């Protein structure tokens, strides 16, 4: 049974365009299925998480990452008697707006769009789901419930101060109450993202030999698991060791998240979802100690992995591709596919830049490379 403060699909605020409910799926299950059937979701399998798809078959991509986040989110929500369908759905959609080549691609595209209000993958996720996906005759987008869209837009909490242009535009027709916190399920999806990416980026980085087990000594709360496992299993292989460490880390983080969230719910005597939205802090959270550990881990990954020679060299090439494609299309808009060119409002530069950014953001890594090579055939980029 759902808690009184859960997001009940039977009490959903509904969809922008009214639809008749189905008898065999609740509203959040319908949204999950709609997301899975989008082109944007399928393209995630060829978009970078940390390592370019060509680097190896076992490294995570945006699709596998999204699936892993969704399993964590669903488990946590179920344990707290919240809507596991909503938590899972938001988790599956949270990375839809990412560019090719991960954060390097996003930084490059944001720099290209500096004069045109920038680029945000979070806002791009909303744009994909409410405008760019063309699957229904009656409307653009996939017409998701209010609760799912709220959770995607408020992935990092309430939106205060300057608001992204597309989010502000959409909010005029479907008020997502940007200044409040999202549902508990959405908060779970956001922290499930943290749990998944810090754990699995560590795993992939060791697999890629960017870091080793000795370097994990900097993270004492993780290193203790390494020491314990080596002591217990004298002949444990490196591949098995990292799997065991990651498994323990994920369990530890989830357990901590559940404990602290239950404490917060009891302390605030939460009885309904509006109380969660109107609190002055996030109800779903880790303990103070674990938040500190997570912050240290993110710093470690940033310094030792994302800024490593290997990742920096790849990022440089990725930046060249994204910025090169942007310039090429802006210089000659006729190189865009006809259906994209039709989206431009006359030949106005701002509109042209936004359409070009939308087109590039939707590319997979391999399509971006192929397109760049085709348009710049004198200098093929093949050494990924």
Curated annotation (Swiss-Prot):
Q: Where is the HD domain?
A: 62-198
Q: Which Pfam families match?
A: HD (PF01966), HD_assoc (PF13286)
Q: What is the name of the protein in this document?
A: Deoxyguanosinetriphosphate triphosphohydrolase-like protein
Q: Which HAMAP family does this entry report, sorted A to Z?
A: dGTPase_type2
InterPro entries, A to Z: dGTPase, dGTPase-like, dNTPase_2, HD/PDEase_dom, HD_domain, PHydrolase_assoc_dom
Record flagged with keyword Hydrolase: yes
Kindly indicate whether the keyword Lipid metabolism belongs to this entry. no
Biological process, per Gene Ontology: dGTP catabolic process
Q: Which CDD domains match?
A: HDc
| Keywords of this entry | Hydrolase
Regarding protein family, the annotation reads: Belongs to the dGTPase family. Type 2 subfamily.
- Species the sequence originates in: Rickettsia peacockii (strain Rustic)
State the Gene Ontology terms under molecular function.
Answer: dGTPase activity
